[in-house]
Amino acid sequence: MWGNIVEYYHITAPATDGVFASKEPSQETMDSVDSQWKESMDDYNVMLVTIGRSSTENGTYLPGVDGVDASQDLNQTDPLGLSDDERDLINAAVEAKESNGGKVIVMLNNANAMEIDEIKNNDGVDAILEVGLPGGYGFYGVADILSGEANPSGHLTDTYAVTNANSPAAQNFGNYEWINADPTVNINAEEVEAEGIYTGYKYYETRYADTVLGQGNADATAGSSTGKAWNYDDEVSYPFGYGLSYTTFEQTLKSVDVDLANRTVTAEVDVKNTGDVAGKDVVQLYTSVPYTDYDVENKVEKSAVQLLDYEKTDMIEPGESQTVTITADAQDMASWDSICDNEAGTTGNWILDNGTYYFTVGNGAHEAVNNVLAAQDQKVDGNKDNVQTWELGDFDSSSFAVTDRKSVV
């Protein structure tokens, strides 16, 4: 009503040079409002706990303790990590569940990948549901998933790291202003992305592959969350591309055809519903390209695996199958070489190294890289039978030297 003042809790991203301050009420405060809330478990056997992080224009979360309002004293080591208020909320729900039965589901109402390893490892939490920022109407879909009216088929679009601040991108992140910059101008800062392509899964999966292959000093303590040798399982809670369903699926990569003349990679994948309820699945096609002495010498950056494309199935009934065809852009196999001559008479070109190209499908980037490593006779938990290969005999700097619109790169 007019003239009425309403206080509400709204989690927002701080300004670029600001710190994150939790605006959630403490569990003690909520108990004081309704001390009998736990009795609701007598009538309803599922408790939903929502943890949120929003986003805003010209706002960001500074990595690590530098991005947290220390005066709140909430035992928070990163703005995207849990605070004591959030831990208390989850633990209160778990305690109520243990007293009255039922289940606890934590929903992530967020715009940023959070640090949720302690939720994952909490035996009292039965499920974690990533809902993102669906808006008011989108929550009808969330309700359908929670009730079983709909079968989830989404997959993570980012790596959920144990400690965000340990990645190269976070270490390099900051608000670096020009000397004598005009503070009223919104272009008074820059950031040199020294990490190159190694952000998200391209960092975590590449470093993991290097640890398996014993190369690049990848198992050093630098960037380790434990202070010990770097270990993938200590650094990643959930990998890029990971997702769950109320049923199970089996994917089989039947064939891959690379057509450089038409700039396409075409894959056929059989998807079978091996569970008890109907559902949709997502086919993710990954490639692993040769990493040669030339690349090392010329500092060509390559990821251990690269997502080429993906496709969702139709609704598949239990026991039924569907063949999915994915046609990807072959340029996504190429790597940028900053010193290679191009057709404009300068340097900088997309290249394909000669050697073996691996293709695979999987429930996320980590499953994909393990499939490739298994095909390379490494002792990992991967399926080498779900890998197809393609050989390129000669170094190729011409296939993608001109764009599909005939412009020189």
Predicted regions located by residue number:
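C-terminal non-catalytic regions of proteins with extracellular/luminal or membrane-system context
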Residues: 1-409
